[in-house]
């Protein structure tokens, strides 16, 4: 009697997942260091110490870049908004408003610390790759929604006027955005801790004291 071998065993799936994560992490390093266009599938394979075929199986280069952002930003792959993250939901539900603001700033600082450089790569690559452009545009739309939800939370706590939600969301998006983080930390040499302190103060002075 012939026995059919199970090729979808948990151990095989775990190995495939580890290989994919290695490929995506290696690609992320190269994308940030060398740029999207200059990073080849062969270079990714060499960095990850896997075959070029394995890299191609992980997806086209655009898909690997998108996965690199998702892993850096959220720790897993998928189209996640900030407001869907359990850690942020817990922070925003705290009854102490000052504690929420401190936790919110800390959360966004960590998110930028891990993902801002990849976002910069995505922005540059979006001019050359339609798949990256679509993913980047989707990211920007989700971020705008998250910022509006942040501003609406401020209204719910009596921190700003309801009529100021749209403008407050725009300012919040600029203050917490990856470009602002990189301008201070990468370009000007700030530490993430300095940025976190500045961001907390900036939100209070430029949003809460104004709107």
Please tell me what each predicted stretch does.
Residues 63-70, 78-113, 169:
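Hydrophobic alpha-helical connector segments
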Residues 106-123, 130-157, 166-170, 203-208:
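Amphipathic alpha-helical packing segments from all-alpha helical-bundle domains
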Residues 22, 26-67:
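Helix-turn-helix
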Residues 58, 67-68, 150, 198:
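Residues in the recognition helix of alpha-helical DNA-binding motifs
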Residues 1-18:
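N-terminal intrinsically disordered/low-complexity leader segments
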């Amino acid at each position: 009697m012939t026995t059919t071998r199970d090729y979808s065993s948990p151990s095989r799936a775990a190995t495939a997942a580890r290989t994919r994560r290695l490929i995506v992490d290696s690609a992320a390093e190269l994308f940030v260091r060398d740029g999207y266009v200059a990073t080849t599938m062969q270079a990714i394979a060499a960095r990850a110490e896997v075959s070029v075929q394995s890299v191609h199986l992980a997806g086209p280069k655009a898909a690997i870049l998108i996965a690199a952002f998702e892993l850096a930003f959220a720790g897993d792959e998928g189209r996640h908004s900030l407001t869907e993250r359990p850690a942020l939901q817990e922070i925003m539900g705290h009854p102490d408003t000052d504690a929420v603001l401190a936790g919110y700033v800390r959360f966004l600082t960590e998110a930028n610390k891990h993902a801002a450089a990849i976002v910069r790569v995505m922005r540059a690559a979006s001019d050359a790759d339609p798949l990256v452009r679509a993913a980047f545009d989707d990211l920007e739309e989700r971020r705008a929604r998250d910022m509006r939800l942040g501003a609406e939370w401020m209204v719910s706590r009596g921190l700003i006027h309801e009529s100021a939600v749209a403008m407050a969301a725009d300012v919040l998006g600029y203050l917490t955005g990856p470009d602002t983080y990189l301008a201070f930390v990468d370009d000007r040499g700030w530490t993430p801790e300095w940025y976190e302190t500045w961001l907390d103060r900036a939100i209070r002075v430029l949003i809460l004291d104004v709107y």
